[in-house]
Design a protein with these regions (language model features):
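Terminal alpha-helical segments
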Residues: 1-133
């Protein structure tokens, strides 16, 4: 889905920037990342889900700083590609979104080696989004 369709569908709306909300969201993202880091690798689904939540919240902050509210995770991909001009990050986020959905909704299992690689990629993604914020 592209930004035009996201806006037409009501999944992206113009908003005024709310500094207090941004501060609260940044704290929430940090707590989720810390919670993920505190879990042992045996809780891999939870670690990945928490990191995904953290990075999605950081994307929400980035969108708010661009006066946008995004109501659909797929539209964050379009936001990264079309508004932020970071196509690679958009593709990477979409992979994380699909993996998280597969783990949470379809019972996908992931081996430890693959999980460790995903966690590293997610942490690098979070670092990059923080740099953009």
């Amino acid at each position: 889905m592209d930004m035009v369709n996201c806006k037409k569908s009501g999944f992206v709306k113009k908003v005024t920037t709310d500094r207090n909300k941004i501060i609260a969201l940044l704290k929430s993202a940090q707590r989720k990342e810390e919670a993920s880091n505190s879990l042992p690798l045996s809780f891999i689904d939870s670690k990945i889900t928490l990191l995904y939540d953290s990075l999605r919240i950081l994307l929400e902050v980035l969108a708010l700083k661009n006066s946008l509210k995004i109501y659909n995770h797929e539209c964050y991909t379009a936001f990264l590609k079309e508004i932020i001009n970071e196509s690679r990050l958009g593709d990477e986020f979409d992979k994380f979104r699909k993996l998280r959905n597969a783990l949470n909704y379809y019972g996908k299992e992931i081996n430890v080696k693959e999980a460790q690689a995903v966690l590293i990629r997610m942490k690098n993604f979070i670092k990059r989004i923080r740099e953009l914020n």
